[in-house]
């Protein structure tokens, strides 16, 4: 089975990897990494379809759920945890599950990825339903945990998609949409945390960012739903208001505080010269889209 996966093949360019100088190793890695974005480009049309179903889930108050094992699971969790501070989502809107539970994020849990039923249990625990979208991530495209999750997701009517790094992946049989980014042989044979992991991260970035744009979390190219959870983000919020409105830093700061640190509301207040309450009403009527509120 493994010998049929391109991610498990030996890379002809790095047969003498153990004899290379440090610089040669780094140059080889860099050369291989340059091929990843091109491999992702080949899947843009399928990624677009995935974004459409995720956006639909969000519009219907559904959720985006990532499932994976090992590096794939960690990448899903990484994308999920960045959504609340970046886009102002609640913790449930985008979630990530890894085979073996959160403890597997820092330490491998032996055998967890081989059990289909664990994914079913994880998805059952959050009350997965037909409004949700489940995306299974597996570089090999054959992880039982991911297959089990996709099977269960389909059984409850949830939308499904898969991300793998091999063509004709096994998991593609269990999802409606399938992103198969063929990254090929790694410089270190079978180490799919390298090119395959990079490809998965790029695809996840695309899916979450484009979906959030689709539900009004972005104005122009500004992340106007940013949550001010630390000093850096407070300053970023004020700068976003300045960029969006052309107001002075002082005016932006004043409106930011008047708007209870709601960046969108502060922008509307300045551009429409209205009070906080009116700004909130306009945003509500525009379903959170700043451009429509204006």
Curated annotation (Swiss-Prot):
Enzymatic reactions: N-acetyl-D-muramate 6-phosphate + H2O = N-acetyl-D-glucosamine 6-phosphate + (R)-lactate
Domain of life: Bacteria
EC number: 4.2.1.126
PROSITE patterns for the chain: GCKR, SIS
Gene3D superfamilies, A to Z: 1.10.8.1080, Glucose-6-phosphate isomerase like protein, domain 1
Keyword line: Carbohydrate metabolism, Lyase
GO BP terms: amino sugar catabolic process; N-acetylmuramic acid catabolic process; peptidoglycan turnover
Pfam families in the cross-refs: GKRP_SIS_N (PF22645)
Residues of the SIS domain: 54-217
Annotated S-S bridges: none
Active site: 82, 113
First-tier enzyme category under EC: lyase
One GO MF term attached to the UniProt entry: carbohydrate derivative binding
InterPro entries: Etherase_MurQ, Glucokinase_regulatory_CS, MURQ/GCKR, SIS_dom, SIS_dom_sf
Pathway: Amino-sugar metabolism; N-acetylmuramate degradation
Record's function text: Specifically catalyzes the cleavage of the D-lactyl ether substituent of MurNAc 6-phosphate, producing GlcNAc 6-phosphate and D-lactate.
Family affiliation: Belongs to the GCKR-like family. MurNAc-6-P etherase subfamily.
Miscellaneous comment: A lyase-type mechanism (elimination/hydration) is suggested for the cleavage of the lactyl ether bond of MurNAc 6-phosphate, with the formation of an alpha,beta-unsaturated aldehyde intermediate with (E)-stereochemistry, followed by the syn addition of water to give product.
SUBUNIT field: Homodimer.
PANTHER family: GLUCOKINASE REGULATORY PROTEIN
Protein name as annotated: N-acetylmuramic acid 6-phosphate etherase
Source species of the chain: Bacillus mycoides (strain KBAB4)
């Amino acid at each position: 089975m493994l010998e049929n996966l391109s991610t498990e093949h030996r890379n002809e360019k790095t047969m003498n990897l153990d004899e290379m100088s440090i610089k040669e190793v780094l140059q080889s890695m860099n050369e291989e990494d340059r091929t990843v974005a091109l491999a992702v480009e080949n899947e843009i049309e399928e990624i677009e379809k995935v974004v459409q179903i995720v956006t639909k889930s969000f519009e219907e108050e559904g959720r985006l759920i990532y499932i994976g094992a090992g590096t794939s699971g960690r990448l899903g969790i990484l994308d999920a945890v960045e959504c609340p501070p970046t886009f102002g989502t609640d913790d449930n809107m985008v979630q990530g599950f890894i085979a073996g539970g959160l403890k597997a994020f820092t330490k491998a849990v032996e055998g967890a990825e081989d059990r289909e039923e664990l994914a079913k249990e994880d998805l059952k625990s959050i009350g997965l339903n037909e409004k949700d979208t489940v995306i299974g991530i597996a570089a090999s495209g054959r992880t039982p945990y991911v297959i089990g999750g996709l099977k269960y997701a389909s059984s409850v009517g949830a939308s499904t998609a898969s991300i793998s790094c091999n063509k004709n992946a096994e998991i593609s049989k269990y999802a409606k949409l399938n992103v198969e980014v063929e990254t090929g042989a790694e410089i270190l044979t079978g180490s799919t945390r390298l090119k395959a992991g990079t490809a998965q991260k790029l695809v996840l970035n695309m899916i979450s960012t484009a979906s959030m744009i689709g539900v009004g979390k972005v104005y122009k190219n500004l992340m106007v739903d940013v949550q001010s959870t630390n000093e850096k983000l407070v300053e970023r919020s004020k700068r976003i208001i300045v960029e969006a409105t052309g107001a002075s830093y002082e005016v932006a700061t004043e409106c930011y505080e008047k708007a209870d640190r709601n960046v969108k509301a502060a922008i509307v207040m300045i551009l429409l010269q209205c009070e906080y309450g009116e700004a909130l009403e306009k945003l509500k009527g525009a379903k959170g889209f700043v451009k429509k509120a204006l």
